[in-house]
A protein has these predicted regions:
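Binding-site signature for planar aromatic cofactors or substrates
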Residues: 1-131
Length: 131
């Protein structure tokens, strides 16, 4: 599902996470993120309070928008999020956040997102095509 183009954009760009519950949408930019070896998306929880409330209320549904601002290559990813409070992924985010904030903030956990759909958002003939 994650071809090399999608993976490259995910690894080089900021992500916007979108969730919704009770008809109230929420979107947040995330900087602490990576693609796992098995093709899932991992996001460090530093300030994801509303996001977590929404995924708990909606069965884990989440969408990610990612794009290259220079080339306009972009993708919308829909999936299901699971929240982790310990383990290797959480430890990785704790180290990242500790380094960036010099101890003033910490990662409380991590979202691990299993992909269900990847949709092209790049302008052109492939726009809206599911990969």
């Amino acid at each position: 599902m994650l071809n090399e183009n999608v993976k490259k954009v995910l690894e080089s760009s900021m992500w916007d996470l979108a969730t919704c519950s009770n008809g109230e949408p929420n979107v947040v930019p995330v900087a602490f993120k990576f693609v796992t070896d098995d093709g899932k998306l991992a996001v460090g929880d530093v300030f994801l309070d509303t996001t977590l409330k929404n995924i708990n209320a909606n069965g884990g549904k989440i969408a990610i928008s990612v794009y290259n601002a220079e080339t306009l290559e972009g993708y919308q990813i829909k999936g299901k999020a699971e929240y982790l409070t310990n383990g290797e992924i959480v430890d990785t985010f704790k180290a990242m956040v500790e380094k960036m904030f010099s101890g003033a903030a910490t990662a409380k956990g991590a979202l691990v997102i299993t992909l269900e759909k990847v949709i092209v958002t790049t302008p052109g003939v492939d726009n809206k095509r599911e990969i």
